[in-house]
Amino acid sequence: MRIGVLSFQGGVIEHIHHIESLKAIPVEIKNKYELNNIDGIILPGGESTTMGKLLMDTDMLEPLREKILKGLPTWGTCAGMILLANSIENSNKSYLKVIDIKVRRNAYGSQIDSFYYETLIPDISSSKIPLVFIRAPFITYLGSNVKSLCSIKGNVVAARYKNILVTSFHPELTDDLSFHKYFLSTCR
């Protein structure tokens, strides 16, 4: 199984290590041609405005959007979630628009407000999962067909719609492989 990781910035290496530890083949994605021959793609954290601009500058935005809409399993973490969202609060800019959610950027504050949390997410694991939030967004609107997987303090921080998984937090920054296992199971 070949799993693409959008490789502009963010936790690229950490996602690659988790993919390798699950015996899948990671593929760094830096242009639209590398979107071929992958079984799924991860859009990591980073800075969503920069990543969105790079998707446009490399002519990847529309080809990636088309592949996702045709069923390519896709997971967006933090900034990746923002890129996938239909809309972003207090912004007239959105990017891939493939999941019916509205997100609030930096919803938990600045870098200094980053935090760690553990919780049970039954769809993902039977054990508590460590969650790392860094300048994290959360979902402020969830479309009727989008399933909430996890909420913290009343805010949705993980959701799924068909082939698309989104998380506000960074599973790649922990040793826990639960979310990566779950995502890979959708790529088969």
UniProtKB/Swiss-Prot annotation:
GO cellular component, one term: cytosol
Gene Ontology MF annotations: glutaminase activity; pyridoxal 5'-phosphate synthase (glutamine hydrolysing) activity
A Pfam family annotated for this UniProt entry: SNO
Gene3D superfamilies: 3.40.50.880
Annotated keywords: Glutamine amidotransferase, Hydrolase, Lyase, Pyridoxal phosphate
Cross-referenced CDD domains: GATase1_PB
Residues holding L-glutamine: 46-48, 105, 134-135
Record pathway: Cofactor biosynthesis; pyridoxal 5'-phosphate biosynthesis
Enzyme Commission number: 4.3.3.6, 3.5.1.2
GO BP terms in the entry: glutamine catabolic process; pyridoxal phosphate biosynthetic process; pyridoxine metabolic process
Active site: 78 (nucleophile), 170 (charge relay system), 172 (charge relay system)
Catalysed reaction equations from the record: aldehydo-D-ribose 5-phosphate + D-glyceraldehyde 3-phosphate + L-glutamine = pyridoxal 5'-phosphate + L-glutamate + phosphate + 3 H2O + H(+); L-glutamine + H2O = L-glutamate + NH4(+)
NCBIfam families recorded: PLP_synth_Pdx2
HAMAP family given in the database record: PdxT
Subunit structure: In the presence of PdxS, forms a dodecamer of heterodimers. Only shows activity in the heterodimer.
Function: Catalyzes the hydrolysis of glutamine to glutamate and ammonia as part of the biosynthesis of pyridoxal 5'-phosphate. The resulting ammonia molecule is channeled to the active site of PdxS.
Entry similarity comment: Belongs to the glutaminase PdxT/SNO family.
Name the UniProt record assigns to this protein: Pyridoxal 5'-phosphate synthase subunit PdxT
Species this chain originates from: Clostridium kluyveri (strain ATCC 8527 / DSM 555 / NBRC 12016 / NCIMB 10680 / K1)
Classification of source organism: Bacteria, Bacillati, Bacillota, Clostridia, Eubacteriales
Gene name for this UniProt entry: pdxT
